[in-house]
Every structure is written in structure tokens, then in C-alpha cells.
């Protein structure tokens, strides 16, 4: 059975978010096309996603010195445990659907923190004499991103940092098969906002058939 993680990073629901509306349309269509698959929702705004901080570095230092989990402080244990949970959940899935808004040319900070929980040497990638090699090959991902302007092409494509960073990190850990759906231009062309949303939903439903 294929396991799909529906990873969202938006404090708004589908009623208040173009991206979430498209994401939920995709998941609904996916479930209809693949009723045997398991879909798990991870709302990053309601999930413990530790940032890499002094506690985390201290914990890693203790592990490197040969000390065990019991040597960590309570704060270190809580953060490391949460990071491990996020990592293990991600590693044991087969498909990933990220739904994010663009905030100031990137995605919400919690997405970066989440990716930092995933890019762990010896778990999702390894170092070799020829450079790092991703360990999550054979998996695939979809990124649905909503932007007020148009960033998929033209002069502003170069500053779509969230899309580029997510694709780069996923590729680094071995997830090289990625799809992208842009829900864009709603603020630049408010009179076409509903049309843009409906077109993106149609695109998402079609993609769900072969994802």
C-alpha cells in the first residue's frame, strides 16, 4: 500500500486559501483514483517542528561523543524526539504533497524548519567519495504553491526561492521525481482569481490520476 503525506503550511483553511483549495481538490481526486492508498495529513502549523538551535547542536554533539539519549537535557530530548518523529514519518512514506503559500519570495519559515528535520546524514543522504548521495530514491513529490503574482515564468521566476529550494532539498535526499502546480496571479489579476483557481483545480485533478 502506498503512503502519501499531505504536508500543508498555511494557517488558513481551503475557504480562505487558493492553494489549500487546490491541494484539497488534489487529495480528494487522488483518494478516488487510489482508494487503497493511505493519505496522512501533516499540518505544519499544528505539528511540533523544532528548529535547529543550541539544544539540537548540543544533542548532536553528545551523540557524536558516544553519549546516549539519556545524557540529553529534557529540552534536548523533546526536540530530538520530535525531529526523529518527523524524519521517520517522512522516510516511511512513498509520495509527498506539499501545499505552501509564497511569503516574501519563499514559503513560511516552518517549511524550512521541517526540511531541516529531514536532511539528516546517514538517514536521507550519505556522503561518498564522489559527493553526497540521496537515499530516498523511488519516491515522488508534488509542490502546490499559491502566489499573488506570476512567478512560474518571466522576470520574477528567479526569485521564486521557495519552489527552487524545496525541489533542491528533495533532490538532495533522493526524491528527484517532482511535479509542480502554480496557483498564481490572483492579486495581480483579481478579476481572474476564480478562473485561476478553477484552472489549477482542474490541473490538480488530472495530475491525481497519474501521480
Curated annotation (Swiss-Prot):
Alphabetic keyword roster: Flavoprotein, FMN, NAD, Oxidoreductase
Cofactor requirements of the protein: FMN
Catalytic activity line of the entry: 2 a quinone + NADH + H(+) = 2 a 1,4-benzosemiquinone + NAD(+); N,N-dimethyl-1,4-phenylenediamine + anthranilate + 2 NAD(+) = 2-(4-dimethylaminophenyl)diazenylbenzoate + 2 NADH + 2 H(+)
Cysteines joined through disulfide linkages: none
Note on cofactor: Binds 1 FMN per subunit.
Residues that coordinate or bind FMN: 102-105
Enzyme Commission number(s) of this protein: 1.6.5.-, 1.7.1.17
Gene3D superfamilies per the UniProt record, alphabetical: 3.40.50.360
Stretches that traverse the bilayer: none
GO terms for MF: electron transfer activity; FMN binding; oxidoreductase activity, acting on NAD(P)H as acceptor; oxidoreductase activity, acting on NAD(P)H, quinone or similar compound as acceptor
Pfam short name (any one): Flavodoxin_2
Residues in coiled coil: none
Function: Quinone reductase that provides resistance to thiol-specific stress caused by electrophilic quinones. Also exhibits azoreductase activity. Catalyzes the reductive cleavage of the azo bond in aromatic azo compounds to the corresponding amines.
NCBIfam families according to UniProt: PRK13556.1
Similarity comment text for this entry: Belongs to the azoreductase type 1 family.
Subunit field text: Homodimer.
Name assigned to this protein: FMN-dependent NADH:quinone oxidoreductase 3
Gene: azoR3
Amino acid at each position: 500500500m502506498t503512503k502519501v503525506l499531505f504536508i500543508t503550511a498555511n494557517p488558513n483553511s481551503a475557504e480562505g486559501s487558493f492553494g489549500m483549495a487546490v491541494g484539497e481538490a488534489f487529495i480528494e481526486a487522488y483518494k478516488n483514483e487510489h482508494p487503497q492508498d493511505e493519505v496522512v495529513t501533516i499540518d505544519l502549523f499544528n505539528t511540533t517542528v523544532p528548529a535547529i538551535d543550541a539544544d539540537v547542536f548540543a544533542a548532536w554533539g553528545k551523540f557524536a561523543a558516544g553519549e546516549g539519549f539519556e545524557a540529553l537535557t529534557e529540552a534536548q530530548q523533546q526536540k530530538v524526539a520530535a525531529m526523529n518523529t518527523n524524519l521517520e514519518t517522512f522516510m516511511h512514506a512513498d509520495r509527498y504533497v506539499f501545499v505552501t503559500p509564497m511569503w516574501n519570495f519563499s514559503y513560511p519559515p516552518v517549511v524550512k524548519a521541517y526540511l531541516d528535520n529531514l536532511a539528516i546524514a546517514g538517514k536521507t543522504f550519505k556522503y561518498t567519495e564522489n559527493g553526497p548521495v540521496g537515499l530516498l530514491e523511488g519516491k515522488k513529490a508534488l509542490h502546490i504553491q499559491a502566489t499573488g503574482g506570476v512567478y512560474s515564468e518571466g522576470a520574477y521566476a528567479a526569485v521564486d526561492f521557495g519552489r527552487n529550494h524545496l525541489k533542491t532539498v528533495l533532490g538532495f535526499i533522493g526524491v528527484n521525481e517532482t511535479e509542480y502546480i502554480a496557483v498564481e496571479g490572483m492579486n495581480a489579476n483579481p478579476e481572474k482569481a476564480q478562473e485561476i483557481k478553477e484552472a489549477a483545480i482542474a490541473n490538480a485533478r488530472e495530475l491525481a490520476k497519474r501521480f
